[in-house]
Amino acid sequence: MLAFRRAVEARELERVGELLTEDVVLHSPIAYRPYRGREMVAGIINLVTTILEDFTYQCEIGAESDNDHALVFGARIGDLSIEGCDFVHTDAEGLIDELTVMLRPLRAVHAFEERMRAKFAAAVAATSTKIEAST
């Protein structure tokens, strides 16, 4: 089983960050441009775990020795069911250097986007406040 899957299922978010390369790229289902860098991507994954309820991986496609994996998952957002797939690429050391996330159905994606944008804006504002306070 992919170490990323084990860490996400166990909600070991610090471990998730350790499994990312420094220059990891995240292709989000709600943003046109990809997010880059371990700190940014780990932070986004952390936010996602606060939005998706009853998150479970249902299927993993790809052999342990492969560099490409697909992790099919299900979750809830309030009373809406959401399904998705994490397409994970690992480098030669087994660290994740690219992650692409797909979600469906559209109504649940809109609910996810609404909640994610609010949490992301709050996180950016909190980070900006910390930076200003330290200068």
Residue map of PLM features:
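C-terminal and inter-domain tail/linker signature
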Residues: 1-135
